[in-house]
Swiss-Prot record:
It holds the Pfam family SprT-like. Its main location: cytoplasm. This is Protein SprT-like. It is found in: Cytoplasm. Residues 7-148 form the SprT-like domain. Binds 1 zinc ion. The keyword Heme does not apply. It comes from Bacillus anthracis.
Length: 152
């Protein structure tokens, strides 16, 4: 799906569910990581996350578009467009738009684990942060530490 197709989709969804035209730009933003989309208040444009389209398909993308169009139309008409506003929640229910989008499966960053071992007493230290082995020593016997394993 390219920029023209997403623009057409947003315009169609706006007319079908809201009965009002979408007069601004809709585009994909590759920098969005965990958000499905966002409505920009100053430009009135809508940015969408392409990864949600890849992962969940067009149905989820239409849900995200409906959510962002709720922000758009309420803001344009001067009503409460924020998540906490009653107007926003009522319009979400009326057009059957999701309040939150699905969670990204690969959104969780894998944790790095560093395993250090004392050269003298063989005590192992498991750390999430890397330590300077020239500066720090074993807390038990003051022996030299050695990095055994680094997982990422």
């Amino acid at each position: 799906m390219d920029e023209q197709e997403i623009q057409r989709l947003v315009e169609e969804v706006s007319l079908q569910y809201f009965g009002m035209p979408f007069l601004h730009k809709a585009m994909f933003n590759s920098r969005l990581r965990t958000t499905g989309g966002r409505y920009l208040l100053n430009t009135h444009n809508i940015e969408l996350n392409y990864r949600y389209y890849e992962m969940y398909g067009k149905e989820e993308l239409v849900g995200i578009v409906k959510h962002e169009l709720c922000h758009y139309h309420l803001h344009i008409t001067g009503r409460g467009y924020k998540h906490r506003d009653k107007d926003f929640r009522e319009l979400l229910k009326a057009v059957d738009a999701p309040r939150f989008c699905k969670r990204m499966v690969n959104a969780e960053k894998e944790k790095r684990v560093y395993v250090y071992e004392c050269m003298e007493c063989l005590l192992q230290y498991v750390r999430r942060r890397q330590i300077n082995t020239k500066r720090y020593v074993c807390g038990k016997c003051k022996g030299k530490l050695n990095l055994i394993k680094k997982t990422s």
